[in-house]
Amino acid sequence: IKTKLSHEDAFSKYLIGQGAKINKPYGWQIKILSPESFLRKIGPVLEKRLTESKFRGLTRMLKMNFWKYELGLWFEDGKLVKVEQTSDAGRILGMNPYATIQLFLGFRSREDLEYAYPDFYVRDGLGELIDVLFPRKPGYIHYCY
């Protein structure tokens, strides 16, 4: 019997406790076509994570360099007020476009990605902030094939 459930839900944990086998999830084949739109959409989640951290009330702009373009995330008093492309050259957050999807979706941590991808980097002591905004979390993508 295949359950097609996350390994983190209560029922799956029960089945595992009864001796069920865990299959590795199939590789993620996800592409975020517009990181700008995606980050706007998850803005309330990012704001909640800030509120529950030492970064409550954050006011600053984060520049994410995606090789061909940069995105600026403007936070004011802990609220994400603007996400848009910027032309300013910045090399503080180097976002490998392929690896960043794993960060945004919680599949890999910032440290995992910095280790695996030399062109994924977080400088100027922003690692902890990125960890708060994009923590590693269990997830499951249901696929229908």
Sequence positions of predicted segments:
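Intrinsically disordered, low-complexity, positively biased terminal segments
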Residues: I1-Y145
